[in-house]
């Protein structure tokens, strides 16, 4: 907005400024400052009125703070939460309104009365539910709407001007919401009906029924746009599969509840028609207002009731009147039962006939009764199909991956049978598929991460892999940017027990960072006889470090390095793999990896360097032992020669004059010579072969650190 306002500000040149007076100049500068500061930020433009008295009327949803203004974003979380709350209130209202049909009660005195206790309870509940409709109207006056002209580009601009919001709402949806919020049943049963007497009492019941049905249909209609708003905001009506199935089952039960209450009201009407027909035969002794319980104190009514045969004429066994599908209400005296009894029976009647599409309904020739049976049959077909279809959709969403895994496993079994794989290979394949399903439940993590934005994908990878990568001492010394680059390129890997990760001598194409499980790493130094080195690696360890010198080489080659060890899984293993090309990319992009500070860390934690260091120390120790034992043999030889001189000498002068001379050909001289030779040959044979074997062990290739900038 600042750029738009800047076009309206006139910039004067130096000549014009000289002509201006000092007061006018300062006034213009202050004016320009006020205009630029007014539209400096979107939030300021909303909170502060403009200089010409007009406020900002439209804005994008991300350009204002919803906590500082009293206009709600229709796509925001608050409106979405309120829509869900209001939807629950609407469902409660749809459940409460049919209960007004249970107000008429057939008394034993052959009259129809209203249940006062039920009237009070329903009035309280209905008034509480109506309050949500009033609150909804108020919220709609405070909710912005999207400008129709801006929908062609992106999400559109929000109209936040209160007058425009009110005008738009009053033109479209206010009147339907207002009629739906009116407490019409309460007004009728408490203010209108008690003031009606005589023959108009019977007609008033029809008015209550028609008004209730009209408002009920209107509230039922308002649920569909409300559900569509929730679906647009969150993508689905219910996030959980069981919640979606329960939602449609609730709607089906609600339809059964409505049909049952309607059937009860029509049963009351049919029974009243039977009484009217009998009353017509006894005219003028019988009047229609006698059928209302307000006339119980009338002595003429009591005299007529004693003389009439009303009970026999309106009995279910009489052929005077056909009750048709309402025969159960008369036979079981449902119309004169208490509320819980008649409610549950009517609910069962509605559910039974809705599920069977009205197959068991035996109607009479009454037109209204036949129409009601037709409506029951049609609603039963439609609603039952919708219930089964939606519940199947929601329930299948929980097992669809399991079915996909079963189909894939069946295809695998057919392929293995077609290729005639041996039994042990089949078992390995089955074990791998089972372990993969248990570990992932058929979810492709890589596909999920690929669909996410780059920053969110980086954060998730960092959360999953950073602690694991930091457990590797070689990578713990790297900076955060390098660790993020490594984490982004790690891919999950699963291994079953007995899986050979890499064999000695095979090209190494990836590094593995172990998350869970144990592996066995061994080497024979290229298959040399008598050489074997083994170790165990587990959680937090890594293997495939032969790739590091290859990745750090400033003159890379296309030939991958050969593995110096055989790595095999002992238990079920979960790991992250870093392939050779990704490691090469990280090494090329981040020069920190070439730091000389990593040299000792790399040597200490590398199994290849550890093996070479152990062999180097053993070779040095063997050389030291051979030199030490050679010196000991020489000392023993000198002592033996000294003892020979002492043995053959006769006097002291001879003993000291030739201390190292031994008569040749003597038996002791020959024995001592053989003994010394055998000792030398034994020591040489013992350490010679080991030194030869260890001496031929090649030193691992060391990373090139010549290009670092330290």
Swiss-Prot record:
Keyword Transmembrane helix among UniProt keywords: yes
Protein keywords: Ion channel, Ion transport, Ligand-gated ion channel, Membrane, Nucleus, Transmembrane, Transmembrane helix, Transport
Entry binding sites for a nucleoside 3',5'-cyclic phosphate: 474-559
One Pfam short name: cNMP_binding
Cell compartments where the protein resides: Nucleus membrane
PROSITE patterns: CNMP_BINDING_3
GO cellular component terms, A-Z: nuclear membrane
UniProt cross-references to InterPro entries, sorted A to Z: cNMP-bd_dom, cNMP-bd_dom_sf, Ion_trans_dom, K_chnl_volt-dep_EAG/ELK/ERG, RmlC-like_jellyroll
Tissue specificity as recorded in UniProt: Expressed in roots, stems, leaves, flowers and pods.
Entry membrane topology: Multi-pass membrane protein
Predominant place of localization: nucleus
Annotated protein name in UniProt: Protein CNGC15a
Record organism: Medicago truncatula
Source organism phylogeny: Eukaryota, Viridiplantae, Streptophyta, Embryophyta, Tracheophyta
